[in-house]
């Protein structure tokens, strides 16, 4: 559904010389100092690409550095307990990425001798790696000629070539993939791939794009027709579900009792507050060797995920606790003084900081 009467042909200069313009622009104006750009090591490239999924560069940089400090090789990552990986990931969100990261490392080490395959089709067979991510890893690590199509690239192509429709729709996505494949240059694939990422992240932004500085400014369909705000088409709106969860915040003055979440679901594998209704607080405290002294409801805390909004309703329970550790592996008493630096889900940390002794 290429609009404007066949915009790929209309934007002749852009269609014929898209890659050349983009590469020249990237060489002069693109990003060159990101930490993962200084290597072709597939482990480091893969780590950066997984972290960058749905996450801004500025957020990824410190996590990337900490991960490499803790796990400088894929062998060390594969051998680490999953809890260590999840704790290091805490705060970056989308925790399935961390679980797939760990599983992928184990597959590469255990089945592939610690070496990533070179071809994008082979890389895409590994856990947690889709077609676009596989192409980026293959291009940056091995110079393979493969097309990427993440959210930023979809926006660039939809605007430049006038592709109509929501990019997440199967028919539109297929069209964008075909377009992305057709534009691949014969050489300099690394600069071209990085240029696409840079253009979408720095100039062809979702709102208020910097069209005058864009290397495609004179051939972009969206700019020529003043449709930057319309392309790409927005996702059809539907109501985002609202969920509520009752949690207990059990403290003995210095510590808080936390539960290790199941591997799947939100905050999978991380420590969080137990989901218990207020009416069950006393029985819950007794079951964990505590005597309930006082209860106080906290203000509801709202947190948004990709597919739903969550309201946490926490009951702060002050208890006299058995000073021994938790009796079951899934339960841990954590010192409240360490909460600020602890690897916890963001909303859980906010609740705990609100009750931490000053």
Roles of regions detected by a PLM:
Residues 2, 18-212, 216-229, 240, ...:
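Catalytic cores of DNA base-excision repair glycosylases
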Residues 1-32, 37-38, 201-358:
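Intrinsically disordered, low-complexity, charged terminal extensions of DNA damage-control enzymes
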């Amino acid at each position: 559904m290429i609009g404007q009467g066949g915009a790929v042909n209309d934007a002749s200069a852009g269609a014929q010389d898209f890659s050349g313009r983009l590469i020249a622009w990237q060489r002069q104006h693109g990003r060159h100092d990101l930490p993962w750009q200084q290597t072709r090591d597939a482990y480091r490239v893969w780590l950066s690409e997984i972290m960058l999924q749905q996450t801004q560069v500025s957020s990824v940089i410190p996590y990337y550095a900490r991960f490499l400090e803790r796990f400088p090789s894929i062998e060390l990552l594969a051998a680490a307990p999953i809890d260590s990986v999840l704790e290091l990931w805490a705060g970056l969100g989308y925790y399935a990425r961390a679980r797939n990261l760990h599983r992928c490392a184990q597959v590469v080490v255990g089945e592939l001798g610690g070496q990533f395959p070179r071809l994008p089709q082979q890389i895409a067979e590994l856990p947690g790696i889709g077609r676009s991510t596989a192409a980026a890893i293959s291009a940056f690590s091995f110079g393979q000629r493969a097309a990427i199509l993440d959210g930023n690239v979809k926006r660039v192509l939809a605007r430049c070539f006038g592709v109509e429709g929501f990019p997440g729709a199967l028919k539109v996505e297929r069209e964008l993939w075909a377009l992305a494949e057709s534009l691949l240059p014969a050489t300099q694939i690394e600069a071209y791939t990085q240029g696409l990422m840079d253009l979408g992240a720095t100039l062809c932004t979702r709102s208020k794009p910097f069209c005058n500085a864009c290397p495609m400014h004179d051939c972009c369909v969206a700019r020529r027709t003043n449709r930057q705000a319309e392309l790409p088409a927005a996702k059809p709106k539907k109501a985002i579900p609202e969920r509520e969860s009752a949690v207990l915040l059990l403290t003995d003055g210095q510590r808080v009792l936390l539960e290790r979440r199941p591997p799947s679901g939100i905050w999978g594998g991380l420590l969080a507050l137990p989901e218990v209704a207020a009416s069950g607080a006393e029985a819950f405290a007794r079951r964990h060797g505590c005597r309930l002294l006082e209860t106080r409801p906290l203000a509801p805390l709202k947190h948004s995920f990709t597919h739903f909004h969550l309201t946490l309703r926490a009951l702060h329970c002050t208890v006299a606790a058995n000073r021994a550790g938790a009796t079951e592996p899934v339960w841990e008493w954590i010192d409240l003084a360490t909460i600020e630096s602890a690897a916890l889900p963001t909303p859980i940390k906010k609740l705990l900081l609100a009750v931490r002794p000053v």
